Amino acid sequence: GPGRGGGRQRRSGYRGRGPIDYAHPRRQTSAPPPPPPTAPSAAPGQPAPPVAGDATGWSMDERLYNQIWGMFEDLARAVAAYRSAVDFAESRMEQELDRALSDPRHRMGGAGDLARERARDRCQDLTARAREVLDRDLSQLAAESAVVEPALPAPYAGWDNPVWHGYRVPMELPMALRLGDLHLPERTDLRIPLLVRLPLERGVWIDSGRTASEAAAATGGDRLRRLAMDTAVTLAARLLAVYPANEFSVHVIDPAGAAAGALAPLTDAGVLAAPPASGAGGVSAVLAHLTRRVDLVQMAVRAGAADSLPPDLDTGEHLLIVNDFPHGFDDRAVTQLRYLADDGPAVGVHLLMVADREDARDHGPVLDPLWRSLLRVTPVADDHLVDPWVGHAWTYEPCRVPEGSRVLEQVLALVAAARRADSR
């Protein structure tokens, strides 16, 4: 054995100094992740210039995902510190004013006015210093955002990002998806991408109701419903584009056929699993098809027999777009939809609803669990999303295709061509 006799030759290069390589000479090990980019050195006293991908992760996509969530948290905490400082300054001013008014000597004459003026000056000074710190932090985050945004891959990028003009159908499953942008009133031009992990863990509800926000109330009902359906179509197109060919299918329920215009990018490209379903019969057929799929996959998973699924069962991810819910839905269809919302995501069936909750008020509280199970977003700006760190109300805006751009149609044409080639 080692240490007995001189029959074993030393490894080339080893001369008894330095660390010993204990790796097996013929056993391959997984390569460590490439190190994240390092920021160039900064001048003394200055923050280091930001670098895209400056976070932990095994891939560039994961590092960018973690970096964006880090920016999200940094912005939330910076604004929380500023708001806390302003609240403290105003609270202290109120206390000083109360003390000044409670002293009879200060109620009359110039002494009281001087005490009140000093209290207000101190409040303004504290507020100004807090704002100076906030502006410094926001400037650093804006500089980081300016570096990160151009480096984002297609699943994370806005529709105005040049990455979409060089789009190619991916070969690997995506990690996350951009649902829209978030901002706070302290600096509305600093937008944080809202990224969600894939596959989706819960369905999405695009609220087409006019009572949701001031922006919604100021938008006409027909216009708001069209914007909501446009948002659903661009989200479905993004999902189709970021998955490999034929790994993601989109189904549509449009009971009255009211969304034909908004659905044109999907129908014209031929990327839907079937034509949009309309009428009670169409609604029933689509729900029965997807319910059967969820049932079969659940049974196969529980039995540990995934290989026993019927050969006609598509094992990819599925998205069901439902327009104008609950129109066209009877009690049985509503029950099936709730089942898909609850049990579908775990087995690859996801729900994207375009609905006004007021339209479903006749169903009463029976639909409350359905609404709660869905991630609510809006077709216009609305401050209804809350962060998990300090509880700010963030204004959400969906990803929109730039006016006059054909990028959506171009991307869907490439998706359709890849699906046809993969089916041969």
Label the model's feature ranges.
Residues 1-424:
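Accessory regions of macromolecular translocation/handling assemblies
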